[in-house]
Amino acid sequence: MSTYAPFAKPLYVMLKPVGAVCNLACDYCYYLEKSKLYRDNPKHVMSEELLEKFIEEYINSQTMPQVLFTWHGGETLMRPLSFYKRAMELQRKYANGRTIDNCIQTNGTLLTDEWCRFFKENNWLVGVSIDGPQEFHDEYRKNKQGKPSFVKVMQGINLLKKHGVESVSYTHLTLPTTPYV
């Protein structure tokens, strides 16, 4: 007999393990000024202690047998792979028979074979931010030195494909890009 209420709805929370930390400086980003809020700790990232506390409490608060962890940024891949491996260890520790799923949003520029193997082996859904064709994407999504990022993003997308990682795209729509949707 299930211990979950038949009318219960899942609780969804977005984790931001890097806060506003990012390797890009997109024109429309609402996080660019956030680092000024954390002058004493500009890297304002989630500690391992907070990670464990959050995972335990988030799983225990669920009223459904499936738990979804959504990792968002800043740029989520600015945290080392070891951080996410630890997160999965903690998810297993506190799962209590629940199914745990993970999805992560990235700008794609830091994807490597190692990251993609991890995502594939652990069945993560990866969202990649790409703002349409190169001429539109590069107009808005530049690195901190003002250089365009489209080529790096496409390299990341190709790595996801190479490794068979399930992925989706996130696109910031503007009037000129809507015909491409």
For each of these PLM feature ranges, what is it?
Residues 20, 24, 135, 179:
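Glycine-centered loop/turn positions within well-structured domains
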Residues 2-4:
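Long amphipathic N-terminal alpha/beta scaffold segment
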Residues 17, 73-74, 106:
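Short glycine-centered, acidic/aromatic-flanked micro-motifs in structured strand/loop junctions
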Residues 7-49:
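Canonical Radical SAM [4Fe-4S] cluster-binding loop centered on the CxxxCxxC motif
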Residues 55-70, 79-173:
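Radical SAM/AdoMet-radical enzyme domain recognition
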Residues 25, 29, 114, 139-140, ...:
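Residues that scaffold the ATP/ADP-binding catalytic core of kinase and kinase-like folds
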Residues 172-181:
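Single conserved hydrophobic/aromatic residue that forms the stacking wall/gate
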Residues 42-46, 76, 145:
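Pocket-edge positions in alpha/beta enzyme catalytic cores
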